[in-house]
Design a protein with these regions (language model features):
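Glycan-processing catalytic domains of CAZymes
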Residues: 1-311
């Protein structure tokens, strides 16, 4: 397969988000995520950074993230292909049927777009927060085994023939009994500092599963420039993320970013996920900012080139 690099993209900002004190930095140009001009600018910046597409974080058909996914796809040039990170299951009040309906809608409404990301002829979809999936009654699973059973039921209703590629997020290899590969979202945090050094272990899980079953599985390596969600602990800055200790990782003028790349490249990932293009609450963005200018677009372009030179 042709190597590619995508970045997590968050399409839910309002102008007041840049003045509320919940972020550690601000974009060079303030924007509302619904603005087509801002989306077009982001696509151009991403291409300048060597990215091949976005993983657009997507909540539901009736959410603004759906309209903004459509804008990303329609505004992209022919060589920029995006997917979604599916999040319907983490919304309050959802149940298994809601997740099934949302996935059916997503596949029917978006994956046939010429700018939707594919591996071969199969659309690729990423998922996050695997253990937060509700059952038929809307209850959360007691453990990963129960979550895997729920996801298995969902896939049997939505895509039993595996016509689409589903990437699971997390550190439990058994999700590959339902999903087609693994990636890790949070590669550094307060509970497990510098967790990115475990990339060879995570890749090994995927390759071992593949060897054991004879079924092709995909490993996506995650790289990131830094992290700073300290301001998310302020009153009024709560969001849908699972509560965790606020944490900051110094970018070291790009040296930290390089270390995450150095951990991932030897694992020969099928593709790379940059976390993130614009996760401002977590402070992991490469989007041009007040503090860093466009430095991280430039560094990302170098890292993308290094990855593709190996393939």
């Amino acid at each position: 397969m042709v190597p590619f690099v995508i970045a997590n993209y968050f399409p839910w900002y309002d102008l007041e988000d840049w003045t509320g004190g919940c972020t550690s930095d601000t974009p060079l140009e303030s924007y509302n995520s619904d603005d087509s001009g801002a989306i077009a600018r982001h696509i151009a910046q991403a291409q300048r950074a060597g990215l091949d597409g976005f993983a657009v974080h997507w909540f539901a058909p009736d959410d603004r993230t759906n309209a903004n996914l459509s804008k990303v796809l329609s505004l992209s040039p022919a060589n920029f292909h995006s997917t979604v990170t599916f999040l319907t299951h983490i919304l309050p009040g959802k149940n298994q049927a809601n997740v099934v309906d949302a996935l059916r809608y997503l596949i029917a409404s978006h994956t046939q777009h010429s700018n939707f990301l594919r591996i071969g002829d199969q659309p690729l979809i990423t998922f996050s927060d695997m253990y937060r999936v509700p059952d038929e009654a809307g209850h959360l699973p007691a453990d990963d085994a129960a979550a895997i059973a729920i996801w298995s039921a969902i896939r049997s209703h939505v895509d039993p023939a595996h016509n689409t590629i589903w990437m699971a997020e997390g550190l439990v290899p058994d999700y590959m009994s339902v999903f087609d590969g693994l990636y890790v979202y949070k590669i550094d945090h307060a509970s497990y500092p510098e967790d990115y050094v475990k990339a060879p272990r995570w890749a090994g899980w995927v390759r071992s599963w593949e060897a054991k079953t004879g079924v092709v599985k995909y490993w996506a390596g995650t790289i990131q420039p830094g992290w700073n969600d300290l301001n998310s602990a302020k009153p009024g800055c709560e969001d849908l993320r699972v509560s965790s200790q606020p944490f900051a990782r110094d970018r070291e003028n790009g040296a930290y970013y390089q270390r995450t790349v150095d951990a991932v490249l030897p694992t020969q990932p099928d593709f790379i996920l940059v976390h993130s293009f614009n996760e401002w609450i977590e402070g992991s963005m490469i989007e041009p900012s007040t503090s860093y200018g466009d430095l991280y677009l430039e560094l990302t372009a170098r890292h993308v080139a290094a990855f593709k030179a190996l393939r």
